Amino acid sequence: MTKTVTVLSGLIRPLVENRLPDWIEPKFFASKEEALELAPQAEIGWFDMYDKKDMAAVISAATGLKWLNSIYAGVDGMPLDLLRERGTVLTNGAGINAITIAEYVVMGMLTVAKGYRDVVRAQERREWLIDSPGKVELFGSKALLLGYGAIGKLIEERLKAFAVDVTVVRRSRPRDSGGPNTLTPDQWRAQLGDFDWVILAVPATPETDGMIGAAELAAMKPTATLINIARGSVVDQDALVAALDSRQIASAFLDVTTPEPLPSDDPLWSLDNAHITMHLSGRAQDKMFVRSAQRFLENLGRWKKGEAVEPRVDLTLGY
């Protein structure tokens, strides 16, 4: 039986090696150099690397690749045009980290609302505070949620448990929505001033690049908080620094920045109303690789049967 050469990162090896079907010939890599050497043999590939440029180089070298799998939900660092030209199927990690990222958003909102960072700093100084530095309740506050994929849906679900009034931005109003808590892409900017929280959970695409700029920040409430767990590219960072420095908006909770890692001399670090969490939201759990491995193994079964693998990325839309 001719086997299907499958090239995989060594990081996933302990979770899949003894569970792979017999029609798979696995080849694992531990470095960029090994990946580049193995890539031309791959019919199926899982090439995830921290350095997106290295990963793109390996993908480019995989000239016979039919299916590329990734643990990452965002695929903005991949050569999507090349994959589309080659007819390669791409599955991503959509939903793998949705639970922990949704929890991170709630944590960020509570951190800002209750002034928790100031509480921690007081503890470090061994100072007993006589009043709370934060006096905002989530109850009854209004949140605008841009991005309604797997992560967005879980954010909405969790915020509703806190009685937050959530409005989601979707391409079209669902027929059963009843209307008021759904906005379309051409409507949300005009209503930015209505919201206490503006939460970004959109994919990084040309359409979302710089979607929050000086005009959008100026339209927000002066008491509002911007939360970004999407990509740094969706926010004009210079405009955000200016808005935070002048207190045009109250604060920002930023899991993502431009660039990453954020240089030590970047002005964001020195702003007391900027909360920077170093793109840790998706890593704040220990099930990422387990879930990804299980999904990959299930998809191998579908692939062998000629069925659709999931979740498949639209290589034109970029998500």
Where on the chain are the PLM-derived regions?
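Glycine-rich Rossmann-fold phosphate-binding loop(s) that bind the pyrophosphate
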Residues: 148-149
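An N-terminal-biased, well-structured beta-alpha scaffold segment characteristic
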Residues: 1-89, 213
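Phosphate-binding beta-alpha-beta segment of Rossmann-like dinucleotide-binding domains, i.e.
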Residues: 88, 93-142, 157, 161, ...
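Rossmann-like adenosine-cofactor binding region
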Residues: 173-267
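N-terminal Rossmann-fold NAD(P) dinucleotide-binding loop
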Residues: 152-153
